[in-house]
């Protein structure tokens, strides 16, 4: 009985505390080149943080919009201009836009704009990169 109560309390803490706070990712120097990425898991939520050619750093849910497969499995690395889903090869630019979706060209109602990666809020403070899954969280600064 105690274990069940502890598990329930922990699940509530995850929802009420950890899903609503800022999470440290690393220093902006870890994103030296376009295509550099870091994967940060917050319990069951996986986030991929990327550096785009424009120099900006973005955060996305690490989930393909096609079938929900995890996009990036390595903790960190570098890609050549896009994130590619290993399941059906949907490709996303480093700014989250869907660039390629094989075998969708014959679908009249399919729009790449409707299938961009879902953003995760990211802020950089004094060179340190933070993410939050709460769109209403107070600014990190």
Model-based region annotation:
Residues 2-47:
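Non-catalytic accessory segments flanking enzyme active sites
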Residues 31-135:
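Rieske [2Fe-2S] iron-sulfur-binding domain
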């Amino acid at each position: 009985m105690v274990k069940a109560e502890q598990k329930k309390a922990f699940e509530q803490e995850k929802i009420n505390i950890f899903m609503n706070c800022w999470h440290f990712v690393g220093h902006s120097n870890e994103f030296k080149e376009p295509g550099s990425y870091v994967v940060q898991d917050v319990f069951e939520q996986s986030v991929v943080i990327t550096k785009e050619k424009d120099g900006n750093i973005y955060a996305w849910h690490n989930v393909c919009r096609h079938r929900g497969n995890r996009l990036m499995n390595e903790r960190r690395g570098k890609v050549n201009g896009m994130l590619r889903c290993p399941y059906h090869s949907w490709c996303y630019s480093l700014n989250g836009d869907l660039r390629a979706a094989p075998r969708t060209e014959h679908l009249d109602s399919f729009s790449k704009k409707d299938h961009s990666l879902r953003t995760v809020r990211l802020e950089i403070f004094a060179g340190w990169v933070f993410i939050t899954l709460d769109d209403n969280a107070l600014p990190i600064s």
